[in-house]
Amino acid sequence: VYKRQVCNRLLNQPIEDRPSKIVEPRKDSKPFNLNDYDIHKFNPQDRETQKKFYPYFKFRGIDLYTQYAFHRHFCLATKHRTDGLTFANLAFPLVLPMAPDKTVGFEERGRPKMDGSGGYKGKAEGSNSSEGLWIANLTGKPLEKANEIVWFESAYDAMSEYQINPVKMVYVSTGGTPTEGQMRGLLSVTPNARHYLGFDKDDAGRQFVANLRKVATEMGFRHEHVQAYHPLGCYKDWNDALLNKKSAELIAKGEPDTFDYAEFIAAGKAEKQREKEEKNTYHRSV
């Protein structure tokens, strides 16, 4: 609730044109099998296990505290290949909302280049792309009891938004263009939740919002319970907001450049520091 109060200004902002670059798995590939992969997990108590993730998150500005919060919801996955070559990808497990304990695929990101520019982006071979979602439920409650769910086009965007506004909610990534199967699957399990659609602030993202709201209306959701949740100002997506990377295209289109996330994040850190100091002062006085 606090996040929504703080970021209520972000709702229903006007919306740049960006085709999705997610590489979908081949239709003729064999079904996804977790046993085909070697998995390296992030252990919050073991610094050595964390080091391998550094290059995947560094250029995205995603810090260790955010990685700790989401550590159960990502890993490094290396597929067993017949040619003997090995490639580790940052993997975000896809699940079905009705069976959130079974992995049905991966949203994948390759290791970035030395200059930080993007590498491979796609889904693992055989992934259930039509229904599978990355669902990071940080609430400690069953998914069906969630009050607020935030949707994104990528797990990177979800983690970025959390770092800007660290509230333990349900974070969801469609891994590209949202499908009707993904929409109906999650909406059917969470009929009492409010859904915030943090898709990209461009023409495609705006269409994704319209599509999801249409499906939600057909399923009986109240209009105000499914809302757009784009970044304020001239930021295309939530990771750009975290990096304070403004879109020249949005600026050229006349998007009001009235909000600066670097200032917003700095103010939040300063407030936390003040609270910490006040708490320490109180304990010393007692």
Positions of predicted regions on the chain:
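Non-catalytic accessory segments of DNA primases and related replication-initiation nucleases
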Residues: 3-59
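Short, small/acidic-rich helices and loops at N termini and domain boundaries
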Residues: 3-9, 73-76, 246-247
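A broad structural signal for alpha-helix termini and local helix breaks/kinks
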Residues: 11, 61-62, 165, 190
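Serine endopeptidase catalytic core focused on the charge-relay Asp
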Residues: 54-64, 88-95
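Alpha-helical elements of the RecA-like P-loop NTPase motor core of helicases
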Residues: 55, 159, 210
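Short, basic/aromatic recognition patches
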Residues: 63-85
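Phosphate-handling DNA/RNA-contact segment within nucleic-acid enzymes
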Residues: 81-188
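TOPRIM fold recognition
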Residues: 163-286
